[in-house]
Amino acid sequence: DSDEFLEMSQIPRSLIVVGAGVIGVEYATMFSALDVKVTLIEPRKTFLDFIDRTLIQEFTHQIRENGVDLRLGSAVANIEDKGDHVQLELENGRQVQAEMLLFAAGRIGATEKLGMEAVGLELDHRGRFSVDRKTYQTDVPNIYAAGDVIGHPSLASTSLQQGRVAACHALNT
């Protein structure tokens, strides 16, 4: 996973990154700069949707120019460990292989066992809360949510700030 990925003892010759979110793109560009052959796979047809489309178009051009094989709209159907490499089969039938695989398709908050229906809160299909983005208050007064349980961007720094805003609002400060 992305937390332990940098502890590897040697740099791979090739890398597949599944997930073109902030973390996946960061690792893909970092390893590409180290002359690693990188394939970045994203099941959606777009990526980093919270960034201006014009900037993303230019960024897409630059990372491809730097050697990243960007595969948008490509979902993974199967993963096989072949010993000296990993082989992925995509839903379109194409195969991709590399020495190493990084799964960076995001984190999901552990909300399924919270029993939120008991207080009248519903979660979306990914187990996320709907909140007021100015206060991080849910539809139920006095219940707030921040970080991975509300969706993108799921970054520690962003989550920390969301938590601060929610706490200030909850305490009326």
Feature-to-residue mapping (PLM):
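Rossmann-like dinucleotide-binding cores of NAD(P)H-dependent redox enzymes
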Residues: 7, 12-16, 22-87, 91-92, ...
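FAD-site-proximal beta/loop scaffold in flavoenzymes
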Residues: 1-11, 95-169
